[in-house]
């Protein structure tokens, strides 16, 4: 009877039983995170965090999932215990190697594309968490002088205990879809230190309003996704009818396919945000010294309006998968820039390549993230032209702002086809159908930026007479 109910429930929302089981466990992270608040001791909180995360993993993916999770967790902890000076390096490369192996073995991208589910998505989040923990423990050996602010804030002087480490990795199912957070934040939250310390007024932030907002947002996102997805199937890209359409209709379909797919991620991240908020970990401070309004940005992984209305492609990482973008900036982008040098296209491309490999070795992922590097660099060029225009020519500046917005819309939704369909053939068929417009435009903009280099106009200071 239970199986029949699961089958009927899954059919009613157009997903498989495996996906429905995952969704139920994923939503259950909200009440489970809420109960964390009532666990009396630090040790109890760590045990509850680890046990609840492992149990939800078992219900969602089966017993083997926890065995998979143990591998990067063991790599990270062993590297910290055995050879601290290279613990971050060891965990980064071995953790990614195991993740890539799982991606290849399970062909996870194909499973997700066909509506299936497996534990590799959670393994992706977990891999980032163990890497950041190891790198921060490595940073704890270094002198503060010369460290970036993020390194100073997140570095670990002492090695976390095994139960603290397990609690951090599996915390109430937060490894399902993120957001990625730091070990130091987890420890301070558990021990009620830092911003989580009870204030002199004895005031604690109430998470309920922010949690309800996140749940309401998730419901809207799911409703929109379920409404749109039957109307814009990805299979249409290789159907003869698609090729019979005119250019504008084909490009419009690409835009709507990307727009539709994003609502699935908006839903997932809204639920994970609600879960982290209700636990208290999502608290990020007060808006002012009077402690009248709490901020809950630590749990935020997406700004929907920010993504859909981004004025520049440079803003996309600030609004989309925010915590992973932050992780990539702190642990890849900033660390491959030589001291005293500025980051350039190479650092951007290397960071996007790491992001592509993290998602899986599908051609569509690689193409998307290489495209996104071109997109961002092209957007920077347009912005430089915009800044070079004198303030008195405000109309022309606004025209370039509009051009940058349209550029971002066109290139982002064109590029996202690869992320959705994954295969090289389907990606190239879709790109060819719109004459590779999203590849040609960024390259043309970048070439033009070399031919027409500009410097921002600086306001002149008046000379004293």
Curated annotation (Swiss-Prot):
GO molecular function: 1-acylglycerophosphocholine O-acyltransferase activity; 1-acylglycerophosphoethanolamine O-acyltransferase activity; 1-acylglycerophosphoserine O-acyltransferase activity; acyltransferase activity; lysophospholipid acyltransferase activity
InterPro entries membership: LPLAT_7/PORCN-like, MBOAT_fam
Assigned keywords, A-Z: Acyltransferase, Endoplasmic reticulum, Lipid biosynthesis, Lipid metabolism, Membrane, Phospholipid biosynthesis, Phospholipid metabolism, Transferase, Transmembrane, Transmembrane helix
TM region(s), chain numbering: 15-35, 55-75, 86-106, 161-181, 214-234, 266-286, 356-376, 399-419, 434-454
Subcellular location, record wording: Endoplasmic reticulum membrane
Main location: endoplasmic reticulum
Residues the record marks as active site: 359
Top EC category: transferase
Alphabetical list of Pfam families matching this protein: MBOAT (PF03062)
Topology in membrane: Multi-pass membrane protein
EC code: 2.3.1.-, 2.3.1.23, 2.3.1.n7, 2.3.1.n6
Quaternary structure (record): Interacts with GPAT9 and DGAT1.
Similarity field: Belongs to the membrane-bound acyltransferase family.
Function: Lysophospholipid acyltransferase with broad specificity. Mediates the conversion of lysophosphatidylethanolamine (1-acyl-sn-glycero-3-phosphoethanolamine or LPE) into phosphatidylethanolamine (1,2-diacyl-sn-glycero-3-phosphoethanolamine or PE) (LPEAT activity). Catalyzes the acylation of lysophosphatidylserine (1-acyl-2-hydroxy-sn-glycero-3-phospho-L-serine or LPS) into phosphatidylserine (1,2-diacyl-sn-glycero-3-phospho-L-serine or PS) (LPSAT activity).
Protein name per UniProt: Lysophospholipid acyltransferase 2
Native organism: Arabidopsis thaliana (Mouse-ear cress)
Gene that encodes the chain: LPCAT2
């Amino acid at each position: 009877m239970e199986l029949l109910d699961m089958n009927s429930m899954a059919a009613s929302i157009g997903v498989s039983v495996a996906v429905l089981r995952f969704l139920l466990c994923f939503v259950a992270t909200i009440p489970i995170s809420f109960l964390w608040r009532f666990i009396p001791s630090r040790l109890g909180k760590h045990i509850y965090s680890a046990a609840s995360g492992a149990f939800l993993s078992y219900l969602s993916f089966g017993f083997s999932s926890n065995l998979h999770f143990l591998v990067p967790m063991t790599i990270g902890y062993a590297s910290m215990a055995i050879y601290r000076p290279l613990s971050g390096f060891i965990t980064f490369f071995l953790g990614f190697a195991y993740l890539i192996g799982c991606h290849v073995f399970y062909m996870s991208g194909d499973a997700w594309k066909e509506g299936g589910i497996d534990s590799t998505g959670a393994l992706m989040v977990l891999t980032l968490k163990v890497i950041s923990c190891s790198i921060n423990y490595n940073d704890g050996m270094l002198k503060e002088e010369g460290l970036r602010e993020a390194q100073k804030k997140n570095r670990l002087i002492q090695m976390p205990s095994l139960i603290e480490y397990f609690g951090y990795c599996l915390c109430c199912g937060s490894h399902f879809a993120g957001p990625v957070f730091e070990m130091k934040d987890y420890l301070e939250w558990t021990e009620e230190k830092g911003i989580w310390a009870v204030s002199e007024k004895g005031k604690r932030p109430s998470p309920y309003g922010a949690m309800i907002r996140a749940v309401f947002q998730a419901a809207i996102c799911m409703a929109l996704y379920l409404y749109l997805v039957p109307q814009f199937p990805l299979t249409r890209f290789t159907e003869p009818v698609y090729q019979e359409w005119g250019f504008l209709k084909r490009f419009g379909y690409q835009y709507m396919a990307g727009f539709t797919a994003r609502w699935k991620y908006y839903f997932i991240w809204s639920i994970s945000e609600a879960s982290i908020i209700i636990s208290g970990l999502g608290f990020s401070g007060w808006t002012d010294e009077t402690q009248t309004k709490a901020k809950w940005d630590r749990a935020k992984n997406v700004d929907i309006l920010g993504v859909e209305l981004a004025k520049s492609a440079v803003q996309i990482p600030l609004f989309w998968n925010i915590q992973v973008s932050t992780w990539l900036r702190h642990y890849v982008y900033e660390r491959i820039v030589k001291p005293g040098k500025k980051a350039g296209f190479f650092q951007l491309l290397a960071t996007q390549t790491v992001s592509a490999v993290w998602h899986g070795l599908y051609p569509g992922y690689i193409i998307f993230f290489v495209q996104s590097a071109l997109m961002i660099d092209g957007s920077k060029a347009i912005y430089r032209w915009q800044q070079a225009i004198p303030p008195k020519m405000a109309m022309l500046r606004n025209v370039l702002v509009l051009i940058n917005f349209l550029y971002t819309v066109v290139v982002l939704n064109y590029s996202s086809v690869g992320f959705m369909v994954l295969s090289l053939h389907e990606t190239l068929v879709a790109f060819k159908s719109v004459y590779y417009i999203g590849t040609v435009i960024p390259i043309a903009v970048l070439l033009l930026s070399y031919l027409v280099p500009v410097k921002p106009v600086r306001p002149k200071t008046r000379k004293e007479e």
